[in-house]
């Protein structure tokens, strides 16, 4: 396979989590919104900070910065609303981001077998190699909740 056959040119959204930048495929991004009231309640997933209400939907807020950078985000400038799941069961998830987001066109290199499950691909932008995120591996979803035993009173 030649180098040009390995590349897949796609639109991506760059997002900032602390000092690092990551990317999502643009077709996974629903919108970028200002932080709003977050509702917190008792639940079993440590990966969910709470929920926000957006366009008539309850959207889980998942701070993935701690998983990706080792530090939780102190300042949340925006929520990047993204889709995750399969075509028959798409969920929205809100990812807190600490800076501006940018839409770019980039050549993607597929993730290798030795890469972490949360890496869908790699891209190069402004001399920086950036991970393109796999939200299905990074955020909790229906398959996670279904595999956990029910709690009975």
Spans of model-derived segments:
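An acidic, low-aromatic, low-complexity terminal/linker signal
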Residues: 1-153
